[in-house]
């Protein structure tokens, strides 16, 4: 499958401003997971994060639009595959208090899945980081991030429409080269985001070739709740695949130009989908 070229977005601002915005965005997302062993275990894979997202979206669509309430059967029907894994994941969400089960008053066999405050607050913070970066890159006017926090109707409208983001992630799977390579691995998306953050911190201005930065595999593994051997293996394979260039003598790496282009293409597409949903939510309320 051919890689996706970057959208014609966010290219009018300076290189330095773009570097700063992306570094701050990556840092904010990484900080949400840094040292949070339980969160990383629960949401370590894309399927798990998306299943939780689908659950919350369906709950808000029921609350706002009168759509069908989320149940395990509904999530499994929409997932199409991996239904046993999905059932185990929902059980973990219930066990950790992120989701509660509510019996249907007319049919006690039916259990509705109700996202709890911890899960909703985490989603709100996660969306806010994306809208902040959209504003910094010029994809959205200022004020959307603040409105997400302060305006309940806007948050509800955004979440109701956020399923389109998940749909696009699925339809674009495998289209972003090196980013897709990382994202398919356990914790790989967060590892790639941390590498992107450190790249832009080391390269606030354009350099050719780009400057290398320290490779702290043990610290990275500990912070993201991954095994040292898993992270070492992932980074070794990434170097062999041409996503990273390694200076073993100085224990440093740099992103290859191809990997940087592919990852920035993914990020700009991803953020543009958030911007579209934000525009639609604003029009709705």
Specify the residue positions occupied by each region the protein language model found.
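Long compositionally biased, domain-poor regions of proteins
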Residues: 1-3, 15-105, 110-129, 163-285
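An acidic intrinsically disordered interaction segment
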Residues: 7-25, 147-164
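Compact structured core domains
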Residues: 125-172
């Amino acid at each position: 499958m051919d890689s996706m070229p970057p959208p014609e977005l966010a290219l009018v601002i300076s290189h330095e401003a773009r570097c700063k915005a992306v570094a701050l965005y990556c840092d904010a997302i990484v900080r949400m997971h840094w040292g949070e062993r339980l969160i990383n275990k629960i949401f370590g894979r894309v399927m798990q994060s998306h299943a939780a997202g689908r659950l919350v979206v369906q709950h808000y669509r029921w609350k706002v639009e009168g759509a069908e309430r989320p149940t395990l059967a509904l999530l499994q029907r929409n997932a199409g595959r991996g239904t046993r894994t999905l059932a185990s994941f929902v059980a973990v969400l219930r066990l950790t208090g992120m989701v509660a089960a509510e019996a249907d008053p007319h049919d006690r066999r039916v259990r509705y899945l109700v996202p709890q405050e911890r899960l909703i607050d985490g989603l709100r913070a996660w969306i806010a980081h994306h809208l902040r970066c959209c504003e910094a890159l010029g994809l959205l006017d200022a004020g959307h991030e603040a409105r997400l926090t302060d305006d309940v109707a806007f948050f509800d409208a955004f979440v109701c429409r956020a399923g389109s983001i998940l749909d696009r992630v699925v339809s674009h799977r495998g289209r972003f080269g090196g980013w897709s390579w990382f994202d398919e691995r356990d914790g790989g998306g967060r590892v790639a985001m941390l590498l992107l953050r450190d790249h832009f911190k080391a390269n606030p201005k354009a350099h050719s070739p780009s400057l290398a930065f320290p490779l702290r595999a043990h610290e990275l593994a500990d912070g993201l709740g991954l095994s040292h051997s898993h992270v070492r293996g992932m980074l070794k394979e990434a170097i062999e695949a041409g996503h990273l260039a390694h200076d073993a003598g100085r224990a440093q790496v740099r992103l290859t130009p191809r990997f940087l282009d592919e990852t920035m293409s993914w990020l700009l597409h991803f953020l543009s989908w958030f911007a579209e949903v934000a525009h639609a939510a604003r029009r709705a309320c």
